[in-house]
Amino acid sequence: YDKRRHPKKLTPLAYKQFIPNVAEKTLGASGRYEGKITRNSERFKELTPNYNPDIIFKDEENTVMNQWPGVKLRVTEGWDEDGHHFEESLHYEGRAVDITTSDRDKSKYGTLSRLAVEAGF
């Protein structure tokens, strides 16, 4: 009797596929918009910085490295205050992140999306 957990087969997400299958701004995906966080707001203190020098952005489980040795997770946008997103963007609250891989290989994006879903994003 084998009690070991077998790794789940990761199916890449399709282009423009969402998990859950609803748009980013809907209640089912991200909850209510709570308002933009600025550097001077109290909520700014709740954001968690990441200073790990070995990765472009934190990947504690090394899922990207395990999937593609030598490749790092690359965050292109996280919390933001520049005003370049739509008015109620979750980037302004620190609840949205745009990711890619360090080698910028677009063929990896479907699997990268699935890894993000499996990690709870």
Swiss-Prot record:
Chief location category: secreted
Binding site for Ca(2+) 2: 61, 77, 80, 82
Compartments in which it is found: Secreted; Cell membrane
Xref: SUPFAM superfamilies: Hedgehog/DD-peptidase
Subunit comment: N-product is active as a multimer.
One protein family per Pfam: HH_signal
A GO MF label: peptidase activity
Annotated binding of Zn(2+), by residue: 91, 98
Post-translational modification: The C-terminal domain displays an autoproteolysis activity and a cholesterol transferase activity. Both activities result in the cleavage of the full-length protein and covalent attachment of a cholesterol moiety to the C-terminal of the newly generated N-terminal fragment (N-product). The N-product is the active species in both local and long-range signaling, whereas the C-product has no signaling activity.
GO cellular component: extracellular space; plasma membrane
Lineage: Eukaryota, Metazoa, Chordata, Craniata, Vertebrata
Superkingdom of source: Eukaryota
Similarity comment: Belongs to the hedgehog family.
Ligand binding (Ca(2+) 1): 60-61, 76-77
Keyword tags: Autocatalytic cleavage, Calcium, Cell membrane, Developmental protein, Hydrolase, Lipoprotein, Membrane, Metal-binding, Palmitate, Protease, Secreted, Zinc
Function comment: Intercellular signal essential for a variety of patterning events during development. Signal produced by the notochord that induces somite patterning, dorso-ventral patterning of the brain and early patterning of the developing eyes. Displays floor plate-inducing activity. Binds to the patched (PTC) receptor, which functions in association with smoothened (SMO), to activate the transcription of target genes. In the absence of SHH, PTC represses the constitutive signaling activity of SMO.
GO process terms (BP): animal organ development; cell development; cell fate specification; cell-cell signaling; central nervous system development; neuron differentiation; proteolysis; regulation of gene expression
Domain notes for this protein: The sonic hedgehog protein N-product binds calcium and zinc ions; this stabilizes the protein fold and is essential for protein-protein interactions mediated by this domain.
Name of the protein: Sonic hedgehog protein
UniProt cross-references to InterPro entries, sorted A to Z: Hedgehog, Hedgehog_sig/DD-Pept_Zn-bd_sf, Hedgehog_Signaling, Hedgehog_signalling_dom
